[in-house]
Amino acid sequence: MNFLRKILFPVAFVYWIVTWMRNYFYDKQIFKSKSFDLPIIAVGNLSVGGTGKTPQIEYLIRLLQDNFKVATLSRGYKRETNGFVLANNSTTVKEIGDEPFQFFTKFPKIKVAVEANRINGITQLLKLENKPEIILLDDAFQHRKVKAGFYILLTTYSELFCDDFILPFGNLREPSSGKKRANMIIVTKCPSDISELAMSEVKKKLDVDVPVFFSKIVYDELVYSEVKPIKTAEIKLTEKTIITGIAKPFPFISHLKKENDLVLEFSDHHNFTKKEIDNIKELAKNKTIITTEKDFMRLKGSLSKEQLFYLPIKSAFLKEADVLDKIILDYVEKSSRNS
């Protein structure tokens, strides 16, 4: 805990009161939430960034897309457009943001839309001729103007929300009591060898009455480019430049880095300027450049196709994935029947 955060404690206390009152007014229906007549799953967290929302949304897409018409709705963080945008084949990453662009690129079966006003976003999606049967709301745990039918709360194993405090003293967007809105909690970025005892201790600390699942990040065995894939084990041995623009890059970097590699770290969702691209070209020269899948969406077209690669990740559950899948599918099927 640094000195600046200590002196900001009074500000955090005021922020805690404001966010608590906001939730209280929604809970008591003084502030109104809008419901929609279809299954809506909201995925989010209580803390700021880096909990692994993107691979979790992708897990849900893979689970649902073969049997349901799926749409994702995101705010479109750092995009250069306003209002509702539905992705199509001419859409660019600048128009919808890196994460939605990644969804659109990887999952051609689904609809991908962005809109900061989620009520309007859902309304526009439901006006489509081939409208979705289920909507996944990305980073929407605090977006209480919409009442989703199912809430998935994410928290990282190394930074549980129950050990944190409200901004700016800590990293929480709202008091940890917000956990009571969750229908399910997923503890992300767990070590592969986590013990049953450690899982039990985490569940006890979280102190919730909903199912708790544990997931880890799995790195692909291949790194990809617009030209050809290469084995990850092979590229680890080469001297390379690693570029990240994500919230918590250390695991990604440590998975790939060897002693002489150059690492360039940028802020989360960073929009690269021409000067920065030119600097990357100069520093990397003829070396392989490897980045995250999200950053690749923003860097491709600016760097050499032969030089630029990305390493995909997935969310994998350490146990009871079938139980989680059944809970989600049961909700969707039951909600669909009632709509």
Model-assigned labels for residue ranges:
Residues 1-39, 331, 335:
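A transmembrane-helix-recognition feature enriched in membrane-embedded lipid enzymes
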Residues 2, 160-288:
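C-terminal accessory "lid"/substrate-recognition subdomains
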Residues 14, 54, 103, 138, ...:
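Residue-level signal for inorganic ion chemistry
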Residues 23-89, 191-192:
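Walker A (P-loop) phosphate-binding motif
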Residues 43, 73, 155, 215, ...:
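Hydrophobic residues at beta-strand termini and immediately following loops
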Residues 75-78, 139-142, 246-249, 292-298:
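Short, polar loop motifs at secondary-structure junctions
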Residues 77-79, 83-205:
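Phosphate/Mg2+-binding loops and adjacent switch elements
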Residues 220, 267-270, 306-334:
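Short, flexible loop segments at boundaries between secondary-structure elements
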